[in-house]
Amino acid sequence: MTVVDAESRFHVLAVDDSLIDRKLIEMLLKNSSYQVTTVDSGSKALELLGLRDEGDDSSSSPSSSSPDHQEIDVNLIITDYCMPGMTGYDLLKRVKGSSSLKDIPVVIMSSENVPARINRCLEDGAEEFFLKPVKLADMKKLKSHLLKRKQQLPMAAAAPDKPPHKPDEAAASAAAIAEAATAQTDGIISDCSCSGSSKRKAAAMEQEVISSPDQRTKPRLSSTSSGLAVET
């Protein structure tokens, strides 16, 4: 298998305190073309996922098939229910309570068929509850949950925010032009009013000069057949 093929496979984190069950689930997952990381406790699973079990002071490292004290990206978690320290249900609650991990599908396994336990896990976010021994047919059920999450990832990405609303530039330009035109029209009307007023004022002054007493008593010259004559 090429490196590209290996990287393109879904990555499953398997958690089980039983070495035999852990090896079985690892084999089934690999036969189903999944990339697998296994750990033997819920606290180690949290450590690999970037969370920390507050009640676990153990310094032991994960199993040999897992990276040592590294945060890893996984596409699905499959965990045993009955484990010492942290149960599979406790691990489910921690994962679903994390803002960064809550979308990772979690599948729980158990050798005990307890309906109340099964219902509680499914109601609190588990995708499936498998009864042990786990079969190859169970592994095929995982793909639908993996594909569902893969389709949800692009949809979950935040849509780009709309740019802040800006006034329409064309409308702003039109408003500016209209305002300038109005101002120009007002100026023309004002000029016309001033011009008319000046003409009326000049006509009044001319009339006043004509009707002035000095102008009426002033002698006027008139022409006759014998020459010029003075009229009073």
Swiss-Prot record:
Expressed in roots, leaf blades, leaf sheaths, shoot apex, flowers and panicles. The keyword Transcription applies. InterPro entries: ARR-like (IPR045279), CheY-like_superfamily (IPR011006), Sig_transdc_resp-reg_receiver (IPR001789). It comes from the Eukaryota. The keyword Transferase does not apply. GO terms for biological process: cytokinin-activated signaling pathway; phosphorelay signal transduction system. SMART domains: REC. Residues 11-147 form the Response regulatory domain. The modification 4-aspartylphosphate is found at residue 80. Residues 209-232 have a biased composition (Polar residues). GO terms for cellular component: nucleus. Keywords: Cytokinin signaling pathway, Nucleus, Phosphoprotein, Transcription, Transcription regulation, Two-component regulatory system. PANTHER family: TWO-COMPONENT RESPONSE REGULATOR (PTHR43874), TWO-COMPONENT RESPONSE REGULATOR ORR4 (PTHR43874:SF106). Belongs to the ARR family. Type-A subfamily. This is Two-component response regulator ORR4. The gene is RR4.
